[in-house]
């Protein structure tokens, strides 16, 4: 099984890293995530630039990882056109630091990536978790670093394994 892991928080997100490591045993895994923050991007794919930059990045324990100059919806769309090799069987987006519940779920780039996956005929899963204390989107922040990333990653892995 080929698995694409993405998010809306950028390739340096600790939630993305934990998720990728947890899903690695389930197939050929590729990480392709935005080169910067795209929270609130929903399932947007544009405006589509004439060129979209992608560059290899290092994530500990992951063989193939890319930083892409675009929102997660565009990344999933590009993946459906073989921008990262053969077609994917599954797209998993997250782990988002924030619950993504209620009406704001429609604005979530994390959820948007899963929606675009479904639109291109691939199963998509979005993983979010409530933040410690308050919503924090800066990954150097002490509260975000206290998130229980491994717990959410373990739950995601159990969903994928079934």
Predicted regions and their residues:
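Nucleotide-activated donor-dependent transferases that construct or modify glycoconjugates
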Residues: 1-9
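Glycine-rich, Lys/Arg-enriched anion-binding loops that position phosphate/diphosphate groups
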Residues: 119-162
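Hydrophobic/aromatic ligand-binding patch that stacks against planar heteroaromatic rings
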Residues: 113-118
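Short beta-strand segments
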Residues: 6, 32-34, 93-96, 126-128
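A cross-family phosphate/adenosyl-ligand binding-site feature
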Residues: 3, 14-82, 86-87
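Glycine/threonine-rich flexible loop motifs
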Residues: 99-108
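Short glycine-rich anion-binding loops that position phosphate/pyrophosphate groups of nucleotides
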Residues: 9, 37, 71-72, 96-99
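Short, Asp-centered acidic motifs that coordinate Mg2+ and/or phosphate
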Residues: 90
């Amino acid at each position: 099984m080929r698995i694409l892991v993405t998010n809306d928080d950028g390739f340096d997100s600790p939630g993305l890293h934990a998720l990728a490591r947890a899903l690695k045993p389930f197939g050929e895994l590729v990480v392709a995530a935005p080169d910067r923050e795209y929270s609130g991007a929903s399932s947007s794919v544009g405006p589509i630039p004439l060129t979209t930059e992608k560059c290899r990045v290092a994530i500990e324990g992951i063989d193939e990882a890319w930083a892409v100059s675009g929102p997660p919806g565009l990344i999933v769309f590009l993946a459906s056109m073989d921008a990262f090799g053969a077609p994917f069987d599954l797209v998993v987006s997250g782990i988002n630091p924030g619950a993504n519940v209620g009406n704001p779920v429609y604005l979530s780039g994390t959820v948007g990536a899963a929606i675009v996956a479904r639109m291109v005929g691939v199963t998509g899963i979005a993983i979010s978790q409530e933040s410690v204390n308050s919503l924090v989107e800066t990954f150097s922040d002490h509260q975000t670093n206290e998130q229980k990333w491994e717990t959410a990653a373990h739950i995601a892995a159990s969903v994928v394994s079934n």
